[in-house]
Swiss-Prot record:
UniProt site positions, description: Functional determinant of NMDA receptors: N612
Encoding gene per record: Grin2c
Annotated domain remarks: A hydrophobic region that gives rise to the prediction of a transmembrane span does not cross the membrane, but is part of a discontinuously helical region that dips into the membrane and is probably part of the pore and of the selectivity filter.
TM region(s), chain numbering: 555-575, 627-644, 814-836
Region (Disordered): 918-988
Name used for this protein in its record: Glutamate receptor ionotropic, NMDA 2C
Organism: Mus musculus (Mouse)
Amino acid sequence: MGGALGPALLLTSLLGAWAGLGAGQGEQAVTVAVVFGSSGPLQAQARTRLTPQNFLDLPLEIQPLTIGVNNTNPSSILTQICGLLGAARVHGIVFEDNVDTEAVAQLLDFVSSQTHVPILSISGGSAVVLTPKEPGSAFLQLGVSLEQQLQVLFKVLEEYDWSAFAVITSLHPGHALFLEGVRAVADASYLSWRLLDVLTLELGPGGPRARTQRLLRQVDAPVLVAYCSREEAEVLFAEAAQAGLVGPGHVWLVPNLALGSTDAPPAAFPVGLISVVTESWRLSLRQKVRDGVAILALGAHSYRRQYGTLPAPAGDCRSHPGPVSPAREAFYRHLLNVTWEGRDFSFSPGGYLVQPTMVVIALNRHRLWEMVGRWDHGVLYMKYPVWPRYSTSLQPVVDSRHLTVATLEERPFVIVESPDPGTGGCVPNTVPCRRQSNHTFSSGDITPYTKLCCKGFCIDILKKLAKVVKFSYDLYLVTNGKHGKRVRGVWNGMIGEVYYKRADMAIGSLTINEERSEIIDFSVPFVETGISVMVARSNGTVSPSAFLEPYSPAVWVMMFVMCLTVVAITVFMFEYFSPVSYNQNLTKGKKSGGPSFTIGKSVWLLWALVFNNSVPIENPRGTTSKIMVLVWAFFAVIFLASYTANLAAFMIQEQYIDTVSGLSDKKFQRPQDQYPPFRFGTVPNGSTERNIRSNYRDMHTHMVKFNQRSVEDALTSLKMGKLDAFIYDAAVLNYMAGKDEGCKLVTIGSGKVFATTGYGIAMQKDSHWKRAIDLALLQFLGDGETQKLETVWLSGICHNEKNEVMSSKLDIDNMAGVFYMLLVAMGLALLVFAWEHLVYWKLRHSVPSSSQLDFLLAFSRGIYSCFNGVQSLPSPARPPSPDLTAGSAQANVLKMLQAARDMVSTADVSGSLDRATRTIENWGNNRRAPAPTTSGPRSCTPGPPGQPSPSGWRPPGGGRTPLARRAPQPPARPATCAGSPQPDVSRASCRHAWDARWPVRVGHQGSHLSASERRALPERSLLHAHCHYSSFPRAERSGRPFLPLFPEPPEPDDLPLLGPEQLARREALLRAAWARGPRPRHASLPSSVAEAFTRSNPLPARCTGHACACPCPQSRPSCRHVAQTQSLRLPSYREACVEGVPAGVAATWQPRQHVCLHTHTHLPFCWGTVCRHPPPCSSHSPWLIGTWEPPSHRGRTLGLGTGYRDSGVLEEVSREACGTQGFPRSCTWRRISSLESEV
């Protein structure tokens, strides 16, 4: 009766409380029933806080109801719950599900499936038994499912690389699901999990203890995972302690089910026990109840905002179960997505939290639960060590199966990386390791560590040893030094960790030596090493003279100074004296019989053959010269092919590597003797430094200032040129050289090793692990496992021999020398250009006037003709068209020499060079002497009568600049001039005198000539148009022809380029214009012709002194011919040197005017005063009326388009034209000075 009285009183109190509520107030309030699983002090304290006033911060009014379930009888529990649901309008239930209330949770799940009332468990004790829940149940749990706990437990195993483990379960409900979950996770993972043993024991009261002991003693796994209840866990750990499975050498992991309450762990639980709980494991019962009530209130508030009213209360247990109403289903959906105080309470359809935050806890040495890890959003964050393996004095606990291993980061043996930022764990093929920080927690109990991931050659050796020898390990990085050195009597580094028993083992690039072997034990060496030297390849800098390095300097000198010059001179000499080629004879002035092949052309020919240049060249004609050129061409092929074949080897970047023979090399022993001093160093506190310090004192003293903090710093110093050589362990250096980017680092002698030794595993003195580890290492060497690991970790791409010679593109550094050569050539050209202008504009004016200049002129002309030759002209039968662009410089020189020969013979020099020089000097003095003025009459050879013209003659082409303007002269008496008179183009008189001398064919349109006769007309008109005065002032004598016989061509910019067709067309037009009538008027003439020959004043009166003399009453020395005007005066060579005016160029003569005269050389020109009658040596032009022309001489004419002048024409004219005893002195002087002006 007493058992039924309690629930009855409880229901009576609940009904009274519900009846006391106002109607209106109850409709706006959410009723929540809180069911406690026990009636302890915590539950009593929580009940006192369950008042509406404690939930005022929630959006809705809360009416809490409490109920305690002290009896585990299912019938009594159902009576209480159903009575509560029938008496009160309850919206939801909050249930305290401890681990000992699994039956209550199952009953509540059944009630929820029948009444559709939301039930929220807040402690997580029912998470295991309610997998899965009843269909249609609205049971929600703040705890985590068994599957989620297994996920975190396996993450802890993965974190420490505990791949081998055993599973022990009891017959507690859910153990089959647990085993199934373990196998599913192990099979789905990419890690090679090894499930060593699976035991299912009867751990309840009265179970077979002997069988349990026997099975537990068969377990040989260092890691064990157990599944049982709290009471069964106490029995299991007690039996495991007797079987030797409890202690520092074994790790136990259990789910939340085995813990129960975390307030007071049982005494049988071992230190270091690991479990997984929710983040609310430290919250009080009152806080958990408040979270449950808030979730129901927030869900109801969300429902009211959508539908405008609160959800309907739950139904009665006595009513017939039916389908879930839409309102209850909608309210349940609103409960699945709730956020409270910044925490996400989203539930899955199975009733568990979607993203729960779990905590990994471990039982420390003080018998308290301590958080060592946190699982948040799929990432595990662990704090090291997982279990307290150290005492308060940091001394490790004696463990026969678990080892603490110290290591040191050094590639490739130990490579340290950060964890994966996405998962927070280590990627496959890596092992979790820790690095101790320099500070501690505020409590001072646990030293914090930084989680890292380690991999490498030594890590793979360690993992293989752990599997073969069967031990677990805790890996950490040393922070108080390097490998190990004794400093002031204290060992540091890995040696110190092992020596002072802070670590059971040390593995890494630890060299075995005698000093270390005295205090610790080493295993057999697993890697052969020693001391090696690493250097850096120098940056490939190509010398600017790299393109010249295929041949030695002696070969280049022999090629271009000796061979090219000698062969060029030889070819030239053979060609010079060849009977079929050019014979350069300057003294006789012979015309060339063939092409001109000079020494310059010979050098150009040989140079073009050497480099296969497609340039215009002139080939020799002699057989001997051709043979020499063929031999040179064969030589050039061999020379160029050899140069090209060896050029690529010198144009690539030259890399220099320091070579040393060993530690006793003079570069190490006497580094100061090198320039600059040799710089080398190592990493201190290692076996390399100890070896050098013990054997080479002076070497160690020098290298101390160049020591590096780490291998990476040393490699950087080598590449930057701060270090010349780095001395270190051969195994490390070979790896660094093989993995170096760009293969800039190399070890001397292809990895030559000095003081050969090996790497070993350090263990404590007289350790019982030494024999087992030595046998395992020897087994790895015999099976080839070590060689496989060396291939994976210790080899690099730079060790491949095919990469020793690497091809690369030639950049600007490779071709710098060629560009430098071009820049130097441009600079020299600029200097020569500046010097040329300086000499031309400044220095040449300061040259004193001396008669030696004429000799220098002849000498320079000879040298010029030697190197440039004389142009060979075609047959004179057909004069070529003028080359307006080239100027025919070579032809002019030859003509000048021929004319000089005739003039010298006329001046009676008799071939003597000295007499010729004196004659030229006398002529110059006579020209500079003052001339007396004469007022007497001048005699003039009669010529054809002229007709006055109103204006002066202008150049052809329509130009407005006069051809010549008369200089104003004082009036003088008429003079008599003997010579050719100036013609009058507008008047045709005295034609009978011309027709008698020259036959004329007359047609219906006038007089016509044959083509050959017309070609002879221009030269005749010029050669006979000469005149000398018997008496005229010497000051007016220019000493040179009035118009240049061989004028220099104008500038290309001002000169229109005319071809043969244009020139022939102009000649035809002029001939047609003059042939239209017997007496053309000035107005009827073409503008180009009329302007060229108009004159401003009438022709003078009669000239006397000839048979056909005509009076010249108005004749004056300065008014009748163009040549005597000062504007057309051409300076001599001497005057050009003194005054800076080029010889043979008029000071005021314009380029286009000069072109006109040069182009129309067949037109009549004024050479003296105009006479009315033609001289006996002249004749009328058959096609140009009013002009006269000289007779032809052996077919030589000065026609259109040619600059040739026969040497015998002037001589014949001097005898036949005027009928005098040779030329007067003035005329001869004028001819010689003409040669000088041409030069």
